[in-house]
Curated annotation (Swiss-Prot):
UniProt record similarity statement: Belongs to the glycosyltransferase 7 family.
Binding-site residues for N-acetyl-D-glucosamine, renumbered to this chain: 280-283, 323
Record-given protein name: Beta-1,4-galactosyltransferase 2
Enzymatic class: transferase
Entry annotated with the keyword Cytoplasm: no
Amino acid sequence: MSRLLGGTLERVCKAVLLLCLLHFLVAVILYFDVYAQHLAFFSRFSARGPAHALHPAASSSSSSSNCSRPNATASSSGLPEVPSALPGPTAPTLPPCPDSPPGLVGRLLIEFTSPMPLERVQRENPGVLMGGRYTPPDCTPAQTVAVIIPFRHREHHLRYWLHYLHPILRRQRLRYGVYVINQHGEDTFNRAKLLNVGFLEALKEDAAYDCFIFSDVDLVPMDDRNLYRCGDQPRHFAIAMDKFGFRLPYAGYFGGVSGLSKAQFLRINGFPNEYWGWGGEDDDIFNRISLTGMKISRPDIRIGRYRMIKHDRDKHNEPNPQRFTKIQNTKLTMKRDGIGSVRYQVLEVSRQPLFTNITVDIGRPPSWPPRG
């Protein structure tokens, strides 16, 4: 009996031992499996960073310095691919600038008696960038306008021009730049050739210019509704100057302030280069416009009023004795004399807070009468 009981007890002990061994083996297997999972988790954590491991939803609003993205595609290693360059914030699309700007004043009081230091003008126009560039902050203009001023020894006039014109052009919602083309030396002045130079040099700085306003430095508009824009036809702005009794002096007058699109300017081969001294070039330009089948566009005479800063005639800007003969021959000369034949040398380009000054050597006039 005792032998039978001992055998049974031995079998029970073996069975219990076998169960304990089996339980131990299962526990060991489960332990290593859990350890492997934890190891993989912490490996991903250290590779991606704590913000992505603990708060994956927050990565969608993280700064651009974070390279990972929650929706990035997985690489062969199982980790998200990092883009080579992260896109920056997209600038909002601005609406087109209105045809009739809402901030215009209308008739303006223009006077030239108060001193006008350049520092004051600069303080009054904080939105104008270096070089005289401006872009409206709240709309997209249809044109990019280059304002070209032929210049020599007129610093006093230029300060008044900048004082009045920058606020006007800004209210007109223009994207524009101001270029003062300064003739070097004391030889005879050549207004039209300087305007050709301004056209070319402005395009070198910004090929987007598609409208060109050519303005004498001593003329200021008396109404900001006289919009400095280009249209389907060449535009004459200064149609009623005070020196002419606020009347158009004659039907073909195109002087003072005018505007042409880039295409219109090239169509007439620019302006003549051979008008040295005062007078004649405006009539030649009018002839070029007429000969190419275009017409002059003008504002209402009540809006196209201008005040001129009074001054004596400039030294070395005497009347051109050949002007009447040249005007009669525009048809013969316009193809050879113009933007395609202008020769000059740029001596200095200086970007000032309110304008870009370009000093140029445009050569000397031929002797009168011409030789040969």
